[in-house]
Amino acid sequence: MSHKVSKKLDEEQINELREIFRSFDRNKDGSLTQLELGSLLRALGVKPSPDQFETLIDKADTKSNGLVEFPEFVALVSPELLSPAKRTTPYTEEQLLRLFRIFDTDGNGFITAAELAHSMAKLGHALTVAELTGMIKEADSDGDGRINFQEFAKAINSAAFDDIWG
């Protein structure tokens, strides 16, 4: 059944998921350990309790090998991605605001290139100058060189930051 669900995702969504998956697959063995999956979830702002995490692992690990492979990962996240309510805005405004505040380290209502670089490095994803400038350019729709909350929310919801994970 999970295979049928994944067929409904478009190629771009599958590629984005693959990039996210690969960036957290530290040893590049094609599977995520529980530690790697936990890091991925935290980077996405999802912080399940230990019980919720165990349930998530049990649900995802269909081979019962203690690892989450890419098809299992796709099967796990596909229902969320395909849900009509989630398709246009995968995050609540509260979640986006919380995430925005993490990146807006000085609290002035804008994310600068320096704040973005620092926050991504803290999340374990150091950015090259090209990645950093590309992300700012992609998200900064008014061209002022910084990202306000509306630009941030739009970028996150449209996966404009997919280069973060690659």
From Swiss-Prot:
Keyword Repeat: yes
MF (Gene Ontology): calcium ion binding
Keyword Cytoplasm part of the UniProt annotation: no
Gene name per UniProt: CML17
Keywords: Calcium, Metal-binding, Repeat
Domain of life of the native organism: Eukaryota
Residue numbers binding Ca(2+) 2: 104, 106, 108, 115
PANTHER family hit by this protein: CALCIUM-BINDING PROTEIN CML18-RELATED, MYOSIN LIGHT CHAIN 1, 3
Transmembrane segments: none
EF-hand domain location: 12-47, 48-83, 91-126, 127-162
Residues bound to Ca(2+) 1: 25, 27, 29, 31, 36
InterPro entries xrefs: CALM/Myosin/TropC-like, EF-hand-dom_pair, EF_Hand_1_Ca_BS, EF_hand_dom
Protein's name according to its UniProt entry: Probable calcium-binding protein CML17
CDD domains for this protein: EFh
Entry binding sites for Ca(2+) 3: 140, 142, 144, 146, 151
Function as written in the Swiss-Prot or TrEMBL entry: Potential calcium sensor.
PROSITE patterns: EF_HAND_1, EF_HAND_2
